Amino acid sequence: MHRGSPRLWFETNRLGSAGLLPGSRFDVVALEHGIKLVPNAHGQYGVCSKERNGRQLPVIDINSREVLAPLGEQQVVRVVVRLDAIFVLRVASEQAKAERIERLRTKLATGEQLASASIAHGAGVLSNVAHAGFKEAGIELDMKVLCEIDAAYVEQSLNCNPVSANATPLCAPIQELVQDEWLMRQVPRVEVLEMGLPCSGASRAGKSKRGLSMMEDHPEVGHLIHAALVLIQKLQPAAIVLENVEDYRVSASAQILRSQLRDMGYQVREHVLRARDFGSLENRVRWALVATTDGLPVVESVSPQGSEPGITLGALLDAVDTDAPCWSSMEYLKSKEARDLAEGKGFAMQLVDANSTSVPTIRKAYNKGGSTDPYVRHPTDARLMRKLTPAEHARIKGVPETLISGMSATAAHEVLGQGVVCAPFRALFAELARCFKRLRDHGPVWIGECASAHRLNGTIG
């Protein structure tokens, strides 16, 4: 732009590589995302010259708004000089941003299902919630691809999770997937991407167990943000939702993700979702990063929904006989509790019953029986307690029980314990879907060029 009007100015000997020398002529050909300058002895435009250090430099000056319209009034452009022509194109980040919005608008206008993808899929709890939230707002998702390292989880999702019915499973470490050139060529573009990268190195327990100074020190999962970004570049989603433990937001990986998404043309918002605020009994807190392509309304907030008046754990418990073998005195845990208290560690057992209005966080390794995990108190014998069943765990988190159908107790608790409580994320995805509908009804609202283009503009002057 020059004084409010578009202007394209070249002053360089590199024009000569395309046959555009001082005194020669050329035509301008409009392209979908730019223009092409083609040498033509009888062309509409001429190449001027300017003397510098005793040499004549070719100069091209185009200031027609109509001719430059395919560039969309970009401040920074990509220039490709070939032997037969010069291509002036939108920078890659701007072109990708425009393509994402146009693809999404087209599908929304026709009522077509929106394609989705899942990274670190597990058995698909977050995927199931994403579909439910979008459906609540009147939009259908169709999951095209899921990435998951655990073959058993993949089989469980394909067999028991209805949202995975049409998905292509990619069962391998994502850092391996992104190195497979053939496979990456098969990856489709999608409108919605949800992912829950492993939190082993970000959680306080994970850091403490391995003695990590930072999350990225974890040898297996500390570097996965790179592979995730490679997949994001390939999938080109209009919107991205990442969920993780709250501590993930202060990691180097989170900062890398924020900065790269910004430079890819996304607007990033972050939310700390407390499940209790959304009617859940479980005191589970998760962090969510929501990235929406510039042009889309952003998810500024996720409205909590108060719990149902008077709801207690009893409504979610199985009918377990008082003499069932699952009841136990768990003397080993009581002994450990006594030792911990004597040593001043402060670890204590957490007992719940039918009248409880809250439940402590139920973790991935719940079936191992940790000393601070929640246990159900026997209704008549104060000496006895039991573990929550997988079905009860699912109900507490709001997860459809069919998703863990046929799984062992250990595997079911793993899937649920590393997953999300459904209510807050269903509300988040429903709000994201409403942002999509506002785009459909009112069109895009651009905040401007990608941050990377702004910095290029500042560097070039």
PLM feature spans:
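Class I S-adenosyl-L-methionine
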Residues: 180-190, 202-368, 458-459
